[in-house]
Swiss-Prot record:
Protein's name according to its UniProt entry: 2-C-methyl-D-erythritol 4-phosphate cytidylyltransferase
Site (Positions MEP for the nucleophilic attack): R164, K222
Keywords in alphabetical order: Isoprene biosynthesis, Nucleotidyltransferase, Transferase
Site entry (Transition state stabilizer), positions: R15, K24
Reactions it catalyzes: 2-C-methyl-D-erythritol 4-phosphate + CTP + H(+) = 4-CDP-2-C-methyl-D-erythritol + diphosphate
Length: 243
C-alpha cells in the first residue's frame, strides 16, 4: 500500500494573534518548529511514500532548508497555498495528478493533515492509511470531555443539549482512497462548495461512502490559540520522557 500525504500549512493563524508574516507552523515546541514534528511523523510512517506541503510562498525557503537539514527525504513538493484550506489541499491534489501524468506514479491513499497538529504518531498514520484502504475513508477522532449544547434561536441563550455519547471531535490526518478524494475536490471546485474538512466533501458528493472512525487519544491537538503552546510543550515533554 502506498500513501501520499498532503499537509495543509498555509493558514495565517489569526486566533494565534501572531504578527504579520508569522506562521504558527514555524513556532517552536520542544526546541523545533511545529511543522518539524509533523513532518517527522510522516517521514517515519512506513505507508507514506511522498509528502506535499501547501504553504505561503514566504515560507518555502525555510521549509526547504528544514527538510534538507532534517533528512525529510519523502518531501516531494512545496506548493503555494490557496485562499482557504480547501483551496490549498486542492492545489496539492493537482500537483499529485500532474506528477502521475508525467511519471505514472500514483498513490492508492491520500492522507490530508493539518500542519499545526505536531503530535500524530507514525503508527497512527499507518493505521489510518490501512483503514482507508479497507473502507475507502477513515477519519481520526476523540470523544468530547465537555457537554455540548446548541445555541438557541436567540443567540444569547442555549437551545437543547446534545447527546455526548453520539459526538466525536474530528481530527486529521483524514485518509481516503485517492480517486474518491480527488473526485470530491473536483466536484466541490465545480460547484464552488466549501467545507471545513475533507470528510465533509466526501459526505456531500458520495453520501453512500462510509467513513471509518479511528479513535485517538488527546495528544493529537491542533495548535490554534496562544493557550495551546504550553499544552503542546507539556505533551512534547511527556512524549520525550516516554521515548
Amino acid at each position: 500500500m502506498q500513501a501520499t500525504a498532503i499537509i495543509a500549512a498555509s493558514g495565517i493563524g489569526k486566533r494565534m494573534q501572531l504578527r504579520e508574516g508569522e506562521s504558527k507552523q514555524l513556532l517552536e515546541v520542544g526546541g523545533f518548529p511545529v511543522i518539524y514534528h509533523t513532518l517527522k511523523a510522516f517521514q517515519m510512517a512506513s505507508s507514506v511514500k511522498a509528502i506535499y506541503i501547501a504553504t505561503r510562498l514566504e515560507n518555502r525557503s525555510i521549509l526547504e532548508e528544514l527538510a534538507a537539514a532534517s533528512g525529510f527525504s519523502k518531501l516531494k513538493a512545496i506548493i503555494e497555498g490557496g485562499k482557504e484550506r480547501q483551496d490549498s489541499v486542492y492545489n496539492c491534489i493537482r500537483a499529485i495528478e500532474e506528477e502521475k501524468r508525467l511519471t505514472g506514479a500514483s498513490a492508492e491513499i491520500i492522507l490530508v493533515h493539518d500542519g499545526a497538529r505536531p503530535f500524530i504518531r507514525s503508527e497512527e498514520i499507518d493505521e489510518i492509511a490501512r483503514l482507508s484502504m479497507q473502507y475507502g475513508a477513515c477519519v481520526p477522532a476523540n470523544r468530547p470531555k465537555d457537554t455540548i449544547k446548541y445555541v438557541g434561536e436567540n443567540p444569547e441563550f442555549f437551545g437543547e443539549t446534545l447527546d455526548r455519547s453520539k459526538l466525536l471531535q474530528v481530527q486529521t490526518p483524514q485518509g481516503f482512497q485517492s480517486n474518491l478524494l480527488i473526485q470530491a475536490h473536483e466536484q466541490a471546485e465545480l460547484e464552488g462548495w466549501y467545507a471545513t474538512d475533507d470528510a465533509a466533501l466526501v459526505e456531500r458528493f458520495f453520501p453512500e461512502q462510509p467513513v471509518k472512525i479511528f479513535e485517538t487519544g488527546y495528544h493529537n491537538i491542533k495548535i490554534t490559540t496562544p493557550e495551546d503552546i504550553p499544552v503542546a510543550e507539556a505533551i512534547f515533554s511527556q512524549i520525550s520522557t516516554r521515548s
